[in-house]
A protein has these predicted regions:
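Short, conserved structural patches
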Residues: 2, 51-130
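Alpha-helical assembly-interface signal, strongest on the long, hydrophobic N-terminal helix that forms
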Residues: 2-73
Length: 130
C-alpha cells in the first residue's frame, strides 16, 4: 500500500470517529448550558429572597408588609412568571422575632422537546425583625 492511499484511508477513519463522538460532545455541551441556566436562576432567586427578607425585617409597622415583601421579591429577581403564591412570608412581626421568606421557581430541562428533569428551585432566608 502506498503512503498516499494509507493517508486517505486514515482521513475517512477520522471522519467516522468524529461522527461517533459528536453526539456525546453535544449532550455534554447541552448539559453544561442547562446547568448554567438553572444555576443562574437559583442565584437570582436567592438574591431576590434576601432582598425580600430585608424589606420584611424593616417594615414591621407597615400595614401591607407581606404584600410589600412579595412585591420586592418579584421585582428583585429577573425571573419571569413568578406569582404571589410562589413567595411565602412567615413571622410574628414582634421586635426581635424572625421573619422567614421562602420562594420557589419552577425549572424544566428538556432536550428536543423531551422533558428530562423538572421541579422547583427553592430558596429561603431568615432575618430578624427590627
Amino acid at each position: 500500500m502506498t503512503r498516499r492511499s494509507r493517508a486517505h484511508n486514515e482521513k475517512g477513519q477520522t471522519m467516522v470517529e468524529f461522527i461517533l463522538v459528536l453526539p456525546v460532545l453535544l449532550i455534554v455541551l447541552f448539559g453544561i448550558f442547562q446547568f448554567g441556566i438553572t444555576f443562574k436562576n437559583y442565584i437570582s432567586l436567592t438574591d431576590a429572597v434576601r432582598a425580600g427578607a430585608r424589606t420584611a425585617a424593616v417594615s414591621r409597622y407597615s400595614a401591607s408588609r407581606v404584600a410589600d415583601t412579595k412585591a420586592r421579591v418579584k421585582t428583585a429577581s429577573d425571573l419571569s412568571g413568578m406569582a404571589d403564591s410562589d413567595v411565602d412570608v412567615q413571622s410574628t412581626w414582634a421586635h426581635g422575632a424572625d421573619v422567614v421568606v421562602t420562594a420557589k421557581y419552577p425549572y424544566r430541562i428538556s432536550l428536543l422537546g423531551v422533558v428530562l428533569a423538572s421541579g422547583d428551585l427553592t430558596s429561603s432566608t431568615t432575618e430578624r425583625v427590627e
